[in-house]
Design a protein with these regions (language model features):
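A detector of single, family-specific signature residues
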Residues: 1-288
Length: 288
């Protein structure tokens, strides 16, 4: 059917499920569901807002954010897997560099581990030979070269003990782990870029991006989980939606003074809010 002939609404199914639920009988059929949807729509007609292009973008953004969260967990698992293997071939190799992932998902410590996958790849060379090899590697991979860093890596390699031998089988194990991590990391960075592009089409984008503690990654994530902010009538509604509103425990004359947050809302939104607050605590912006 043509979109022009129908008015479309996006409604939380939980609202429909709980609507008019005042019968002792529990009926579950397509006919009963259709009647319930119709009754809810007629009863709430004046409050419903028509589904729009902005809603489609928000739905896409939220879907991408859930995928982003999934692949971030996968990336963390692949990272831990690679580190556990490196502990048996080149302990500490993952700690030499802390530069963030590039747009293609590549990371210096991962690329370093792919080339110098065993500690013997470093210490079997002379110091000058390693410095020369490392410098050429940095140039080829377009990473910054530091002679002092090269010396530090070489000197540290003399004290390390490897468990797995330096052979083709061990190299293959490392290669597979690196490839899996790179694939997950690349997907994460692609989603990060796509989410920012989608979020930039929404009217609230400039306001959100101007907030302290929010950047091109957390900003779109925040927008994805909150959705259309205009549907909230007051600030308390947003805190309740996130589940960070204080709970209430009262009965008769008893009133609990300290009650944990309700946590009835979106756990993904709470996670994003926690990350924003973590940035604020660490950066401590003066004019915030």
């Amino acid at each position: 059917s043509s979109r022009r002939r129908h008015t479309r609404f996006a409604i939380n199914p939980k609202l429909i499920k709980d609507f008019g639920d005042n019968s002792l009988r529990k009926v579950k059929s397509d006919k009963a569901d259709a009647v319930k949807i119709a009754r809810y729509t007629l009863d709430s007609w004046t409050e419903l807002r028509q589904y729009s292009l902005m809603d489609e973008i928000r739905n896409q953004l939220k879907t991408m954010n859930r995928q982003f969260d999934f692949y971030m967990k996968h990336k963390t698992a692949m990272k831990n897997n690679l580190i556990s293997i490196l502990d048996q071939t080149y302990p500490g190799a993952n700690t030499y560099f802390d530069s963030p992932a590039r747009e293609d998902g590549s990371q210096k410590w991962v690329d370093f581990s792919a080339t110098y996958w065993h500690v013997d790849c470093v210490r079997k060379l002379s110091l000058n030979a390693f410095i020369d090899h490392y410098q050429k590697w940095c140039k080829r991979r377009k990473y910054n070269f530091s002679r002092s860093k090269a010396v530090e890596i070489y000197e540290a390699s003399k004290e390390l003990v490897s468990i797995l031998p330096k052979d083709d089988l061990t190299k293959l194990i490392i290669k597979q782990a690196v490839e899996q991590l790179n694939t997950a990391s690349q997907t994460v960075e692609q989603l990060r870029t796509m989410m920012n592009e989608a979020a930039s089409k929404l009217p609230e984008y400039p306001v959100v991006m101007a907030m302290k503690g929010v950047g091109k990654s957390l900003g779109p994530q925040l927008m994805a989980e909150i959705g259309d902010v205009s549907r909230f009538t007051h600030k308390g509604a947003i805190t309740a939606f996130a589940g960070v509103d204080p709970g209430v425990n009262e009965s008769g004359s008893y009133e609990q003074k300290s009650v944990p947050a309700s946590k009835r809302g979106s756990s993904t939104l709470r996670k994003t809010l926690f990350q924003v607050m973590d940035v604020l605590i660490k950066t401590k912006p003066q004019d915030d």
